[in-house]
């Protein structure tokens, strides 16, 4: 990802449209990204697999709260949410099952990043 990893992540997520892994899910997840005294909010709406993202504060079935810096590292594929949760750097409120769904979406980006890195490595070896 280039530029702001957080914005790029949510724009990419919103542009995916339909995710077959989430075809049975209808829920909302709000990300509260904290930076100093400022909280940036992103709302992910999943409607039977259809994904949409908005940059607003609204009630949600689950809220994931973490620092913006940490989410930048997650969005760029440098780290994942689970270790950060175990360290107490991520707070989850609401439906914990949705966390598993979100991890799938984040893992998809991490997998793409690893494939891109592997492809770049393979090209350099030729």
What do the predicted segments below correspond to?
Residues 1-126:
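Feature captures hydrophobic
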């Amino acid at each position: 990802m280039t530029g702001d990893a957080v914005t790029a992540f949510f724009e990419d997520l919103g542009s995916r449209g339909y995710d077959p892994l989430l075809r049975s899910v209808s829920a909302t997840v709000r990300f509260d990204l904290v930076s100093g005294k400022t909280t940036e909010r992103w709302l992910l709406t999943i409607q039977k697999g259809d994904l949409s993202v908005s940059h607003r504060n609204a009630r949600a079935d689950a809220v994931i709260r973490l620092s913006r810096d940490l989410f930048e590292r997650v969005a760029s594929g440098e780290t994942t949410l689970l270790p950060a949760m175990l360290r107490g750097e991520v707070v989850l409120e609401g439906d914990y099952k949705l966390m598993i769904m979100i991890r799938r979406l984040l893992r998809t980006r991490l997998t793409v990043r690893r494939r891109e890195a592997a492809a770049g490595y393979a090209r350099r070896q030729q």
